[in-house]
């Protein structure tokens, strides 16, 4: 029936894209975007907005796309989102905005993400920028980290007239958008750098190569540098491991390190001297989006790649689209299996993995059925590289050098969900530094909430 099926999106062929790092999805052209926008029912009580962590007025921007008012659509989106070109490319829209779309009850939900991406890409190609505050309000705010939480918080504060400086530890802004997500999913120069420039166009200053807690401490920013409030959006870059024998062998990487070498340091490009393992057979342990990114990157470097995950396909935490693309490209999924030991040769290099088969038992605290080992089912798989993708936690450098900043047992900063306020007066936090590794869009939502909290704090303090 008319309107039940969404307009398909063009992509690189799997066999072709598995050999390059160019973006997989081409996105909509103007005609496709207008046709897809026409499927929107423009609901008065739009459930899609309730599924959006940054509260974009989805029906309003889609209505403008339908009428080919693409610039107005962009301004509607950019009122709420500092990173519209990023969201669709990496966000779990099937469980957020599109998961709430009423069209999805009897057909395909409206492709909200693809429409947002189209508008953001159109704006970039036509030189359209977000609207800047008319004047500064005289208050200085420091933002630590230039990832999705930091960029969103900084952008929202700048729109309110605050003088905002972002301090970034690395040499390039973008945080996890720059170092953690591969080029074939999120182009760095075309998309990430352009989104960073849009935030700078709002008046935000970005200082790179500044490690807060080492180069300068939060207390010094507030007491000596004149910053009246600080937002911590430093992410969660400390990788977790399994604690099994052999993890210290040569050829074992955290997904964080493996992806950083490729994404930020361009190990995949000729002309760069960044060392990286070009394994012939790679085992990636884990089932999230980061595991898919690491596996698909290793594939493009020429490896046979196996994803080893202790639960089944239904329990994979990765986006369905990422799993689908990985399968299309030839990634092998070894599900309901778990490593018990990394096998090491006499020279200290990985030579294989000992794996035990699993079955699902009763649900655990997350609601997913717990994996249980099957006795006597162990076997060995040859490989020369193992990539651990088991999540990350915040680096304790900031919390350990900031007096009065409370953390929990996972070393995450304790902050209120609605405002991002921490235990230290004037200091706010959000994103992975608070929750541990989560999604880009949730980090953006936290940055947005903190910007509102900081504005309320400084407005009340100065009245």
Regions found by a protein language model. Give the residues of each.
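Glycine-rich dinucleotide-binding loop and its adjacent helix/turn
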Residues: 119-135, 192, 197-211, 239-301, ...
